[in-house]
From Swiss-Prot:
InterPro entries: Glyco_trans_2-like (IPR001173), Nucleotide-diphossugar_trans (IPR029044). Pathway: Cell wall biogenesis; poly(glucopyranosyl N-acetylgalactosamine 1-phosphate) teichoic acid biosynthesis. The gene is ggaA. GO terms for molecular function: glycosyltransferase activity; hexosyltransferase activity. Belongs to the glycosyltransferase 2 family. It comes from Bacillus subtilis (strain 168). This is Minor teichoic acid biosynthesis protein GgaA.
Amino acid sequence: MFSIIIPIYNSENYLRYSIESVLNQSIGFKENIELILIDDGSVDSSPQICESFKNLYPNNIKIMKIENSGPSAARNCGLSNVSERSKFIGFLDSDDAFSQNALQSVYDFFCDSEHVNIAVLPVYYTGEKEGGHKLNNRFEKGTRVINILNDYKAIHFYIGGTFYRRHTLTSTVLFDESIKFWEDAIFFNQLLLKEKRYGAVAEGKYFYRKRKEQDSLVDRSWFNKKRYTYLLNECYMTLLMDSFNKYDIVLPYLQFLIVYHIKLFLYPNYRDVYKSVLDQQEQRVFVDDFIKVLKFIDPQFIKEQDMPMYYKEFMFHLLKENTEALENIKKERVLHSSCTVTSAKIKGLRLELTGHFINQYYEMKENDRIYIKYFKRLKKCKRKELKKTIEVWGYKLRDFRYAGFVVEIPIWAFAFDFVLKTPNDSLELNHVNIFKSLLTRVFKKR
């Protein structure tokens, strides 16, 4: 009934865990599951682990061996070895796992939704990180069919935990082995552009292992030239053109997906790496192509993203868009922002507080001031200049030089409010009980 494909490369530490999650499926392994293990040139004990499981279940497990060719080639090898009797195909990575009810949940969904050919599971982290993936909000309404023409925010771009009716993955539907980045997102979303809908199966779970060495590999990928202009053109532009050719527009779903992913280029750990990887001419081409991709995006889908405001401002800046729409959001959000107390020192009968008002929505100006309000008194804080800015690709997005403050208040005024005063406005910010905060820290340490 199910064929589960696992590409394997040097996965000895977690491979048993992954395979056993398939063996333990409540739907019944011997009766309903074919497991296809593709050894992609492993040099550890992964091949021996595969053989040990095949000896236990010779009728259910296939082992294929290829030279080290990458996950796309391994998955394609798996697809070409799916049995004729299989009705559904699923993908699992060699250090991840399925919940025990995963395949039964997917099977029930496909039985109930005969017109839907793709299904996905919610992702939960295991290992170095725990909790649910940010995109799991799609599953909050329970198991359902998502039509991407209507629900453009329900984006998906990873391959583990995805399932397909066998007839959907014909001999022409393969992973592009020439693409070295984001190949799983290309595969899934090119197919989704044709299908238009997929099932969000809320009952099952896909456990994605978060590892330190994995993070290290991700970090190293930013030092590969193909992570830049190549990714923009061969991945983002490929999807944009596919949508344009099929629908005569770039679907909002794809616009939202690409902005969600392209923001990675702006993250503090990555945004300046390109300068050490690309020469000056390549840097200019990269930035030009970055802007070229953004020009396919309606500013609405930038504005709606859950990301820091200054990333949105930077994208608007590159597009030469009016930021008035963002300014309205910033005015609303600054009311919910807080001053931070970084130190509190007792000086006789007085309390010296040092802190700052740094947030993504507001940059304090020279004539702005922070005040402390205790009882009916309003006390002006002294300014403490900070050397903190946020710059992306040479463009200064925030300068927090005026955001610091220092103030002395009577020791008995342990509860107070922060107030931001500008030439045109006065905004009450957060309430602070300094003794309560100190007690909380003490109990946390215990």
